[in-house]
């Protein structure tokens, strides 16, 4: 038994309006475009628009030598607590306890080293300006 399309089941192409021909394409674009926009958006933008805390669990201790970057997210409408996220040298992210004394020392040390770098850069700019 074979399935064959009857001639009465066919719709003549001249009787379909241009709108009806474009409807399936418009439908597909309508539902696939937002997905592509969401995938193309940077993760920081997505994280900023989510109204929830990033850190669900925190670590009270970490070796400072493992930290490549440190991000502090202040308390706000997305989360009532301050969040400290450390990006490690192995590309993992760890949430740190901002109230832990060890973490406070690490943050102060990083901020202190940033101030020292800024002073060195300012002195270097002054020296190059005085030489010219």
Swiss-Prot record:
In which organism is this protein found? Mus musculus (Mouse)
According to the record, the signal peptide region is 1-40
Name of the molecule in the record: C-X-C motif chemokine 5
Q: Where in the cell is it found?
A: Secreted
Chief location category: secreted
Q: Quote the PTM field.
A: GCP-2(1-78) and GCP-2(9-78) are produced by proteolytic cleavage after secretion from fibroblasts and epithelial cells. GCP-2(9-78) is the most prominent form. A number of additional N-terminal (processed between pos. 41 and 48) and C-terminal (processed between pos. 118 and 132) processed forms have been identified, probably also representing intermediate states.
State whether it acts alone or in a complex, and with which partners, per the record.
Answer: Monomer. Homodimer.
Q: Which Gene3D superfamilies match?
A: 2.40.50.40
Which Pfam family, an example, fits this chain? IL8
* Biological process terms in GO annotation: antibacterial innate immune response; antimicrobial humoral immune response mediated by antimicrobial peptide; cellular response to lipopolysaccharide; chemokine-mediated signaling pathway; inflammatory response; leukocyte homeostasis; neutrophil activation; neutrophil chemotaxis
The record's InterPro entries line, in alphabetical order, gives: Chemokine_b/g/d (IPR039809), Chemokine_CXC (IPR001089), Chemokine_CXC_CS (IPR018048), Chemokine_IL8-like_dom (IPR001811), CXC_Chemokine_domain (IPR033899), Interleukin_8-like_sf (IPR036048)
Instruction: Provide the induction entry.
Output: By lipopolysaccharide (LPS).
Q: Name one GO molecular function term.
A: chemokine activity
Gene expressing this chain: Cxcl5
Q: Which GO terms describe its cellular component?
A: extracellular space
Q: Which keywords appear in this protein's UniProt record, sorted alphabetically?
A: Chemotaxis, Cytokine, Disulfide bond, Inflammatory response, Secreted, Signal
Q: Which family does it belong to?
A: Belongs to the intercrine alpha (chemokine CxC) family.
Here the disulfide bonds are 53-79, 55-95
Role noted for this protein: May participate in the recruitment of inflammatory cells by injured or infected tissue. GCP-2(1-78) and, more potent, GCP-2(9-78) attract neutrophils and are involved in neutrophil activation.
């Amino acid at each position: 038994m074979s399935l064959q399309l009857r001639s009465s089941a066919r719709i003549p192409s001249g009787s379909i309006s241009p709108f009806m021909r474009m409807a399936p394409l418009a439908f597909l674009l309508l539902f696939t475009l937002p997905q592509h926009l969401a995938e193309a958006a940077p993760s920081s933008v997505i994280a900023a628009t989510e109204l929830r805390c990033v850190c669900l669990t925190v670590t009270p201790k970490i070796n400072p030598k493992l930290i490549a970057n440190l991000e502090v997210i202040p308390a706000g409408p997305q989360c009532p607590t301050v969040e400290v996220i450390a990006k490690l040298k192995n590309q993992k992210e760890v949430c740190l306890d901002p109230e832990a004394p060890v973490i406070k020392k690490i943050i102060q040390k990083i901020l202190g080293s940033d101030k020292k770098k800024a002073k060195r850069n300012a002195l270097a700019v002054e020296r190059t300006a005085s030489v010219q």
